[in-house]
Amino acid sequence: MIAVAAAGLFAATEADACTGIYLTAQDGSRVAARTVEWAATPMQCGYVVSPRGHVHQSFTPTGENGMKYTGVYGYVGIYTEYEPFIVEGVNETGLAAGLFFFPNYGEYAPYDKTADAKTICDMQFVSWVLSQFSTIDQVKDAMSRINLVTLDSKIGAVHWRIIEPSGRMVVLEIVGGVPHFYENQLGVLTNAPGFKWHLTNLNNYINMEPGSAADQTLKPGITLQPLGHGSGMLGLPGDFTSPSRFVRATFFQTTSPTWATGRETVVQAFHILNNFDIPIGSQHAKADIPKGLPSATQFTSVTDQTALKMYYRTAWNSNIRCIDLMSIDFHKVKYQSHPLDKTQEQPVEMIKIN
């Protein structure tokens, strides 16, 4: 089973593209949102409800023999391919975490088979964070007590964002076997290269501003005028590469109006991330276009860390669904998992004309 899941993740590295943003409402609600575009084929995705006291078993490249730990906190998380591989989630304290592919730049320390008792697979790191901690500093303090490994070097590395309900966010990247935490005051994250590179790259777009550019008179009788609204954003990159998505997400997030409530901000987050839905056919040569996948964006999730609600929609069903963590008794609830879609079909509301 683990080998099959790893094979699916290897396929995901061929078309990995995740975009994350962060918004704050006027009432103080904090909203973390992201897309997940993985693989050239439909992935098995679902959500899990993990209670307090649940025993988690970590994997290593040699099997189910990694660190075993008991959950301190309950959480809800979305997995891909295999239930323990949580890619985005939030726990009952409001701490949120997610992983984003980081190919060709991240590098973990070599696997040490003599240290299996403290070894965690990178795809299970989010689950470990959500089940054990309520603050970023607790995570940072615990890093020296674990070894992070990959199940297969062909899969490539990931990096992570961890977000407190206060709005503090860090990005964790492991390069040369050394973990690096970066405070993320911007709130945007995509994929490779590293987070600091993306921040530097924003300087290339210093001319960008919302609205329309002013008229420019070149000489008497010759005046250049905007051809439409939004000309202040001329030059904004529109392709699907990680650097371009980071730039777009930054400007869409920072120019977004601040809505009054968390609920309105959740809807705004979905609207912003509409711009990062990747149409099938745009990332592959015609002969390689995947079958049965309506969008490369397999799901989009939005988490209201203040209200403790996790929302999502999928490539097959764009209706928004919500899981309310406050309605869950994490002491009594049983561990459970469910597919994101009961049926992979878009519901359509028929309008009757009298």
Where is each model-derived feature located?
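A contiguous strand-loop segment
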Residues: A17-T114, K154, N354
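N-terminal signal peptide c-region/cleavage motif recognized by signal peptidases
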Residues: A12-T13
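Aromatic- and glycine-enriched pocket-lining scaffold segments that form the walls
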Residues: I136, K140-I174
